[in-house]
Amino acid sequence: LEVKVNTVIRAGYNEHSVKMVADRFIGSDVIVRYIEFMDVGQTNSWNLDEVITGEMMQQMFDELKPLKANHTGEVANRFLRGSQEIGFIESVSKPFCGECNRARISADGALYTCLFASSGSDLKALIRMDATKEQIADAVRSIWTKRDDAYSQNRGSAEHKKVEMSFIGG
């Protein structure tokens, strides 16, 4: 069983505990991943000034050896600290929209092609019409290939109302 502990780091709140979190899991197989504070909806009072970048966090460690990605679209930049794996998810300072391969389906049956989306595509209607697995797969493929979301890359270029990330499983 692979266990990952994801920790959001926010300036003025917990940036002092970056190394302590990793130290807590030394000697275990737990992978520690640090996440830049993201604008995940309208409820977390996000402010760019409160982002501690992955690079800033990496500088808090003495010796990190880069690891290759496990697969295409991997979101964490991975490192070894001794025998401990540590990752940094840098969606604010180093957006990875072009390599993203993640879609989410909300509890109400909408397919979201971006964690920062303002709306999704209705899959529930297809299911209620007794669509086959192939028809649903074709619809998902079509939605995915037509997607043009790149919110993290375009952050700040326009006002953008987002669905709460917690609603779509982020």
Per-range role (PLM):
Residues L1-N44, Q58-L64, D108:
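Conserved C-terminal portion of the radical SAM core fold
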Residues W144-G170:
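Short flanking/linker segments adjacent to small metal-binding domains or redox-active Cys/His motifs
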Residues V40-S152:
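Accessory C-terminal segments flanking Radical SAM cores
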